[in-house]
Amino acid sequence: METLLAGNPANGVAKPTCNGVGALPVANSHAIIATPAAAAATLAPAGATLGRHLARRLVQIGASDVFAVPGDFNLTLLDYLIAEPGLTLVGCCNELNAGYAADGYARSRGVGACAVTFTVGGLSVLNAIAGAYSENLPVVCIVGGPNSNDYGTNRILHHTIGLPDFSQELRCFQTITCYQAIINNLDDAHEQIDTAIATALRESKPVYISVSCNLAGLSHPTFSRDPVPMFISPRLSNKANLEYAVEAAADFLNKAVKPVMVGGPKIRVAKAREAFAAVADASGYPFAVMPAAKGLVPEHHPRFIGTYWGAVSTTFCAEIVESADAYLFAGPIFNDYSSVGYSLLLKREKAVIVQPDRMVVGDGPAFGCILMPEFLRALAKRLRRNTTAYDNYRRIFVPDREPPNGKPNEPLRVNVLFKHIKGMLSGDSAVVAETGDSWFNCQKLRLPEGCGYEFQMQYGSIGWSVGATLGYAQAAKDKRVIACIGDGSFQVTAQDVSTMLRCGQKSIIFLINNGGYTIEVEIHDGPYNVIKNWDYTGLVNAIHNSEGNCWTMKVRTEEQLKEAIATVTGAKKDCLCFIEVIVHKDDTSKELLEWGSRVSAANSRPPNPQ
């Protein structure tokens, strides 16, 4: 059994030479030449390739759809993703939308994946991955990288910025992913892939995996035909800390006269939805939700009082929360948007703030190494039932009036539109709200049990909802997605309505055409907030091109809206439906007017004295 090293003069093999500037070597000076018997003894089965191992891992964790844009560096890898049973490759129109789709998919499935090519694709998807990072979503971003032989050669490659050092893409991803794997050899590829995926799931953040374009089809002994199930060690609370934390929080809350609860967006990453509901059931406290956490707590619960969003909260919600003498916040994020320009009337000394792995009572003490679900479940057993705050809420509560019906041929108003959208919701639907006035109008929708709800508040990237609708609908095929998108946002990412059609999706898109960037107008107006009007239904019809199932309608009155809704929920219930809603450019929610003025004031603060 003889193995010869190529290029070793002792073996009688000439050292390979380069053909000249910009040329490949005649042979690989590091190649191993093995006899057939040796190869049979040392190599893995032909099916145990790097590409197949990665594909199987994605299926194993639930990312059975990968949103991709092909490029020459990832084509071979895409072949292996396509070949994997149980995995579907969804081709997108651009990398940004592929990333947004992986974001939306992760919101439903718990993890998403996208695949792009080196640098030109990677830097294009970067914005979407940054959004997933800010929203605590595990997204596996796979990049087809350069040939492994090109690392360290001082060569200039295409699809780069023209420097011999082509690590710029990696450096960009280092700040917006929790782990980066550069796979340019087979020996540690198995470990790097598994570590990256495990880290994404454990940290609930995106990861970056670059796979050299010449490795996807190669076998290695570590890529077994049936991969060993990946084990992610569970996090556990420190038992002593947990006991002390529960005791401190229970004592604090049990002394309060009218305590309340508020759910925040980090309930998702903590996987604490059921634990939060258990505290609400046991305590008798009224509970609200921060805007970015809508959909994470049960709105059908009898003591749910709405969205707490400072000055733009659900009617009577802020009064109850801010007048409480103690409040339990689970997983909050207090930024300038969620605090309405830092104008919340809350006091730290009254708050128990629980984060995914720590909590603090008032101004102290603070406790680390405790997990939110374990803490909340233990706390539920220690709280005395107290319905005082909820009783106060019931005394002052007056139901909101429905907007009056429009007169015949009267131009449609936005509040009338959302009155009818509310009537469409069920446990078999999900709402995706785009950045803009839809944030505020969709917050008013009372979600039935089982109804999903998603929007991107922390990052707030306009255009996100088109890709997110694609991804969410692909992941949750048992739900019909209702997307509310402004015209300005739609112009950013409209192309992937095409991909929705290719995938046979049946979402309903309400395109709100008011002629500009309404949310920006209310923060700071200017001519840059006016956009060129499109024939949006005509555009979608052109994309449809008689391929797939699609139905469009343009509505200007309430009568037309009723007709459209009857059609999309009846005869066209199995179609992708696109309804362009024409409204006045100044028709906005009162909440946006208030929020915009306060955020504008926060943005306009003068520099501090030096």
Curated annotation (Swiss-Prot):
One of its GO terms (cellular component) is cytosol. Substrate binds at residues 72, 159, 520. One of its GO terms (biological process) is aromatic amino acid family catabolic process to alcohol via Ehrlich pathway. Residues 437-519 are annotated as: Thiamine pyrophosphate binding. Belongs to the TPP enzyme family. Keywords: Decarboxylase, Lyase, Magnesium, Metal-binding, Stress response, Thiamine pyrophosphate. Disulfide bonds: none annotated. Induction: By hypoxic stress. Binds 1 metal ion per subunit. Binds 1 thiamine pyrophosphate per subunit. Mg(2+) binds at residues 487, 514, 516. It catalyses: a 2-oxocarboxylate + H(+) = an aldehyde + CO2. InterPro entries: DHS-like_NAD/FAD-binding_dom (IPR029035), PDC/IPDC-like (IPR012110), THDP-binding (IPR029061), Thiamin_PyroP_enz_cen_dom (IPR012000), Thiamin_PyroP_enz_TPP-bd_dom (IPR012001), TPP_enzyme_TPP-bd (IPR011766), TPP_PDC_IPDC (IPR047214), TPP_PYR_PDC_IPDC-like (IPR047213). Its cofactor is a metal cation; thiamine diphosphate. Coiled coil: none annotated. This is Pyruvate decarboxylase 1. GO terms for molecular function: magnesium ion binding; pyruvate decarboxylase activity; thiamine pyrophosphate binding. Homotetramer. Its EC number is 4.1.1.1.
